[in-house]
Amino acid sequence: LIAVLEKVIRKIFPKNHGGELTGGFLIVVLVCLFSGGVPLLVLHYLYRYLPVAGFVLEVFWCYQLLATRSLKDESMKVYDRLKNGTLDEARYAVSMIVGRDTRELTETGVTKAAVETVAENASDGVIAPMLYMAIGGVPLMFLYKGINTMDSMLGYKNDKYLYFGRIAAKLDDVANYIPARISGWLMVAGTVFTGMDTKNAAKIYKRDRRNHASPNSAQTEAAMAGALDVQLAGNAYYFGKLYEKPTIGDPIRPVEPEDIKRANRLMYAASILGVVVFGLLSAGIRFGLLR
C-alpha cells in the first residue's frame, strides 16, 4: 500500500521541497486512516454481529503483529551462519534485517549489527505494539504499525526521502518516544532474570541512551550494550556513504556471536515483563481501576 501510494503521489505533486513535503503529509494521513480505520470498522462490525469471530480475529491479529518470534528467528539465522557457515553467508543473513551496507563487515561487525537490530526492534516490533494494544486495542496497534512501517520505508535522510519522508519519520519519533524509554527500562529489569549485568545496564542506559541521531533508537541499544558488557553502534555505511555515529557502551569485552543468543534472551525477558505491566495497564483501563 505505501509503495503504491508513494508512486501515485509523486506523480501528482511537483518535484520540489514543498511538493515533496505536501505529498509526504498526504501519504501519512492516508496510511494512518487505512491502518487504524479498517481494523476498527471490521472489529466493530464483528463484535456487534459475530462476537466470537471478532474475538478470534483480534487474538489472531495480536499474534501476527507482535514480532518476538520472527525477530528471534531472523537474528538466529545470522548466528547460525557465523557458527556454521561463511562470513559472506552471515553478511547476507544480516543484510535481511538491517539497513546498513554489510558487504565489508567483519565477523564482529556482523554480530554487532544483529545485536543492535534485536535491541532496537524489541521496542519497535514487540514492546511498543503491546503498549498501544493495551491502551487502544488492536486498531491502535495497527495504527502504530502503519506509522512504524512508513518510517522504515520512507524515513531515510537521502536525496529521495529527505523531504518526502520527513513527516513520516517525525511521526514515528513521536509514536516511539514513550515506548522506547519504557523498553529501555524493561531491558534493564530483564537483566535480573537473565543473569546479565544489571548495574552496568542501568549505568550505560542512563549515560548513552541519547547517543544516536534518532531520539529513540539508542534507548534499548544502550540497555543492551550495558547488559552484555560490550560496545555497540559506531560508524557505519549506508548506501555507500560513511556515517559517523557515536558508540554506545564500554568495550569491557569483545563482541562475540554468542551475544546474539544473549540479546534474544534479554529481548524475551523484557517482552514478558511488558506483558505483565501492560496487562495490568489494560485491565485498569477496561475495568476502571485507573479512574
Residue spans for each PLM region:
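Hydrophobic alpha-helical transmembrane segments
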Residues: L1-F142, G155-R291
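Active-site His/Glu-centered metal-binding helix of metallohydrolases
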Residues: G146, M150, L154
